[in-house]
């Protein structure tokens, strides 16, 4: 109950651009740009306004949280995405390829660099706003997932 709102992977905008250019018979360069809007951040609570049980919920205790009588506690619904959105992410990759034929075989050597500008933006956060009824989580909205760091891949293939 109360779990309406935006789902965790709701990215409103996503753009992907890819291109390559062969500047000679043996050489080509290429690039990829992926731009994504941030996903929603939830603000999950622990309490339950309907009875005294404690569990992961969509309700946050806002008053009388320390009362031993559950019916005296006052809760507010926390819709999915109530914690705002994460920042946009940008990922640019580049590659260079070399082609060579020998006999009846074709060889390709490709060096690709991913996340060329080494963006390290947060892609996931701690969505638990409360650790217990009325107790705020000190790590709420702290990063738990980040963009992959820059890395390179060398590929050699031979077709015969």
Annotate each language-model stretch with its function.
Residues 1-45:
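Gram-negative outer-membrane beta-barrel transporters
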Residues 1-6, 15, 79-83, 139-143:
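Extracellular loop and loop/strand-boundary signature of outer-membrane beta-barrel proteins
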Residues 26-73, 85-93, 97-160:
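C-terminal beta-signal and adjacent terminal beta-strands/loops
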């Amino acid at each position: 109950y109360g779990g309406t709102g935006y789902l965790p992977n709701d990215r409103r905008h996503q753009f992907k651009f890819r291109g390559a250019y062969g500047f000679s018979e043996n050489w080509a360069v290429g690039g990829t740009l992926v731009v994504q809007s941030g996903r929603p951040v939830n603000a999950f609570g622990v309490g339950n306004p309907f009875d005294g049980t404690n569990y992961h919920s969509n309700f946050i205790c806002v008053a009388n949280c320390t009362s031993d009588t559950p019916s005296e506690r006052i809760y507010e619904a926390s819709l999915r995405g109530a914690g705002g959105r994460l920042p946009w992410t940008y990922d640019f990759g580049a590659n260079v390829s070399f082609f060579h034929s020998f006999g009846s075989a074709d060889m390709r050597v490709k060096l690709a660099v991913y996340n060329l500008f080494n963006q390290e933006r947060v892609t996931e956060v701690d969505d638990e706003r409360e650790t217990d009824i009325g107790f705020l989580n000190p790590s709420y909205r702290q990063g738990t997932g980040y963009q992959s760091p820059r890395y390179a891949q060398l590929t050699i293939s031979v077709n015969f």
